[in-house]
Amino acid sequence: MLQPKRTKFRKPHKVSYEGKAKGNKQVDFGEFGLMALEGAWIDARQIESARIAISKRLLKTGKMWIRIFPHMSLTKKPLEVRMGSGKGSPEKWVAVVKAGTVMFEIANVSEELMCEALRAAGNKLPIKVKIVKKGEAN
């Protein structure tokens, strides 16, 4: 699964996913992309399951780009622990995805196969998504 090799700080502040994306809003590398319509923290496991769903349908013919990476660690305190006494230990790595972010891109495959693969990947993610074409205005 995806996670940073090293970070400057182990326990970052929580970053908000509200609002619209400032960058990463259009399809740059492939022909079609999967765009988030709402913001969320996307877990490394969810990114991996979406990647597997796409690669199963591409059948070694197409090319895929993952445009998001889980840079931020989410912490959690153990069960039945009283409040206070510091922040919990890092539990998982998440990518902060805002509305309008292109998360996956695909190229070199027929349009039907691309749409099927991106739809399958969208079903693995906890947010509403749409399939966008290269050059489409957002």
Swiss-Prot record:
Main function: Binds 23S rRNA and is also seen to make contacts with the A and possibly P site tRNAs.
GO molecular function, one term: rRNA binding
Keywords, sorted A to Z: Ribonucleoprotein, Ribosomal protein, RNA-binding, rRNA-binding, tRNA-binding
Tagged with keyword rRNA-binding: yes
Presence of the UniProt keyword Flavoprotein in the record: no
Pfam families: Ribosomal_L16
Quaternary organization: Part of the 50S ribosomal subunit.
NCBIfam families, sorted: rplP_bact
Superkingdom of the source species: Bacteria
Higher taxonomy: Bacteria, Bacillati, Mycoplasmatota, Mycoplasmoidales, Mycoplasmoidaceae
Entry protein name: Large ribosomal subunit protein uL16
GO biological process: translation
Primary gene name: rplP
Any one of the GO CC terms: cytosolic large ribosomal subunit
Family membership: Belongs to the universal ribosomal protein uL16 family.
